[in-house]
Amino acid sequence: MTAYKGEVFNLPPDKSISHRAALIGALADGTTEISNFSGGFDNQSTLGVLQACGIRLSQDIVQGADGRQTRHVVLHSSGLWSFSAPDAPLMCNNSGSTMRMFAGILAGQPFDSTLVGDNSLMKRPMKRIADPLRRMGAGISLSPDGTAPVGINGTRDLKPITYELPMPSAQVKSLVAFAALHADGESRVIETLPSRNHTELMLDLKTEALSDGRRAVIIPGGKSLEARPFHIPADPSAACFMIALGLLVPGSEILLRDVCLNPTRAGYIELLIGAGADIGFENRRVIGGETIGDIVVRYSGSVEPLRIDEPSIVANIIDEIPMLAVFSACATAEFELHHAAELRTKESDRISAVVSNLQRLGFLCEEFPDGFAVKGRQRVPSGKVILESYDDHRIAMSFAIADKALESELEISDREIIGVSFPNFFDIIESLRQ
């Protein structure tokens, strides 16, 4: 089995921070420069809807002193109400982040608009974004199934709100925050379980610990935002796949540079370390409120099976669960997950997708409404095994890593979907081959 060794300087820039940097730049008064912006399809969708609403922006590939090429985005805006009515429905493609968070901005604009997406996105639930925006005074329409198209009758007279998140959701928290910036007065978002906090950090929002253990995010309304520069670190959700590769393949040692180590994003790494994975950190520092550092990964021949059953943990590793499940199955033939029904509403039903593919590889699985378990491997398939991507980039990447770790010949359908978030996925893997 081929070992994978070397340094990775070109992991994809963080998707979550890239989305937010572009949206905040469009809301700020002045010129916003974003270095190392993501070139993935989802983040390009965000730039596309901004341009369709009249925001002036440019993006260029620049070469740094170290020879690396990165994407530099510049946005020009005059503030919160710089947007103009689009000529057609706004195409978000496959990006749920674009659709949900941009809805919060459009709710505060004095025109009507409609958000649409590809076939996958048009099936995803959008009721969760309608309730807070309607309570603030915007008109929101959905399909009879509660999905897109999302019709928005915006207004400059949004009311402030105190909104309790019914479930952990950084996207809903962010859309309420973006809408609340346009309101006349202070708004609060109450969360019982923490979710990723990039929006709070990037907007420099105050938070308050409540007596019952919950947390309030405080958003002042009607105040101008000043443009500021942003630098986008490497995406920890993308790093997850290279970490799994290094842990699973004998003889491997991989160094991942400049990765976002925000505690609300790197919880999966602590899970892996707790299971016995050989993972270390170097060069930790804080830039723009975000903790960034290098991750060192070495092959770990003996790890404990992963069992994930705490809602507070699930909320902050939801994107990494497919890879964690495949990792644990490949390493130990065991895995167990509960309290993750949210996975069924992602780009695919990720619970069923992971279970189906693992079963094709001979693993014994039990599926629950909110998770699943892997209980050993009954057989090793002979010949080529064709696995489904389910048009889901994270499913495709998770099983592409399994292809390197298992003694089976695997083929993944429609693997081009990986370009949604990780265009150079296979290039990096090939560069690490020894």
Swiss-Prot record:
The active site is at 319 (proton acceptor). One of its GO terms (biological process) is amino acid biosynthetic process. Pathway: Metabolic intermediate biosynthesis; chorismate biosynthesis; chorismate from D-erythrose 4-phosphate and phosphoenolpyruvate: step 6/7. It is an enzyme of class 2 (transferase). GO terms for molecular function: 3-phosphoshikimate 1-carboxyvinyltransferase activity. It catalyses: 3-phosphoshikimate + phosphoenolpyruvate = 5-O-(1-carboxyvinyl)-3-phosphoshikimate + phosphate. GO terms for cellular component: cytoplasm. It is found in: Cytoplasm. Its EC number is 2.5.1.19. This is 3-phosphoshikimate 1-carboxyvinyltransferase.
